[in-house]
Amino acid sequence: MDTNVENVKKKHPKGLYLVFLTGMWERFSYYGMRGILMLYLTKTFLEGGLAFDPQTASLIYGFATGLTYFTPLIGGWIADNFLGQRKAVLLGGLIMFFGEFVLFAMHSHIGLYLGLFLLIIGNGFFKPNISALVGGLYEPGDKRLDSAFSIFYMGINLGAFLAPLLTGLLTDNIFASNVTNPETGEIVMSFGYKYGFLAAAIGMLVSEVIFLLFAQKYLGDLGLHPKGGKKKVADAQVSDAPLTKEEKERITVIFVYFFFAIFFFAGFEQAGSSFTLYTDKFIDRVVGGFEIPTAWFQSVNPLFIVVLAPVFASFWNSKFGQTLTTPFKMGTGLILLGIGYFFMLGAVYERGGSIGNDPSDMAVKASLAWLVLTYLTHTMGELCLSPVGLSIVTKLSPPKLAGLLMGVWMTAAFFANAAGGVIASYVEKLGPSIVFTVISGFVILCGLGMVLLNKKLQRMMHGVK
């Protein structure tokens, strides 16, 4: 009997796989949209886009993606106090579906702003609460929890990997067509971006239907009702206790990591903005006579994560890996990000550094190997910094401030995406060689600074590893 109970405990609850599928299809929807957004913003109306200049498009992209990391703070609070996690997930998914559908149905600036607004609001309800449901499936201290989150994030990356492949195929091949410019008589390619947004909307609808049909069966009462009552009273009693000196120093360390993480992700998020525009114009994407859709390169990072995450996890758990401190790991992540920019600079200098838009200039293309090497190195940097950061914030936070400080940590991505949009807006103005060199040098210096702060930060962490 005891053996059977132990075997059951080793298995994950079926609710985890429901959340896995729900999250996977939602990320399919989001990354399908994200993979073509910069192209949609910058292509001409005749080409199926909205004809924004690259600077304006970069700012729109940066602030829109950044706000998707800010609204979960509000959506999580509303779910905890009023809606409950299940209703918040369904409401958020429904709002995001309408956001994607608006992008499909309205080829206009108004449609863009309305669609992005709905996506930002919907994501605020969906994102924090789908993750919270994973944790709610397990009792405190359950050793299966780390494995559960690994499975959940594998679903996220699977959705992020598959989505750009489909949307890129739809926009660049299946629904692309040649049209004649009525003013010049020139034949231009019109891309089917609206159908990419439709695919993203359908993906979100699939997520909603799966969750609606199976939530009661596999989640029971989990997340049905908002938290409150006794828990609020208990939290209020705990929060009256003053912070100790150790807790204050640990919180200071969290804000140091927060500061450096902003710089990392501001450089990392160029993948969706300046890298995408550079890839579309100046990278040789033809392989064996087939031109790879630009959106497909947004699948490279999640593919590398799926392949490399187990390798990094194994290394961190090895005897040598356990001797490496958190500041050293995060500093290494920043340095790897900077090194990745060396490869982008290789692409820039292979074609002479120019980013002019005349046909003779755009005919000079750089090898796609530079881009793949950039994404590989950046993914390695991400695996050094991102999961390590989430783990250490959890460990360093005083229990009464754990939720607040995790929310603060997530807002690093908001500031980083917004800053990344501003940075990307200068690529066209100053040239990629200058912007990429500055980013590379700056984040490498930040990484070295983090390593130099290693001993001091370790002392302030008071034994937390």
Predicted regions and their residues:
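Central cavity-lining transmembrane alpha-helices of secondary-active solute carriers
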Residues: S58-A79, F161, S299-F312
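Hydrophobic core of transmembrane alpha-helices in multi-pass small-molecule transporters
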Residues: G99, I110-N129, S354-C384
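C-terminal ends and interior cores of transmembrane alpha-helices
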Residues: L94-L112, I335-S360
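Glycine-rich segments within core transmembrane alpha-helices of 12-TM secondary carriers
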Residues: T68, D146-V179, V188, G196-S207, ...
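Transmembrane alpha-helices of Major Facilitator/SLC transporters
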Residues: F70, L213, F290-Q322, G333-Y341
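Short amphipathic helix-loop junctions that connect adjacent transmembrane helices
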Residues: G35-T56, A271-A295
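Conserved MFS/SLC helix-loop-helix module at the cytosolic interface between two early adjacent transmembrane helices
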Residues: P72-F104
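Intracellular loop-helix junctions on the cytosolic face of multi-pass helical membrane proteins
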Residues: M1-L18, E139-K143, G168-G289, F312-Q322, ...
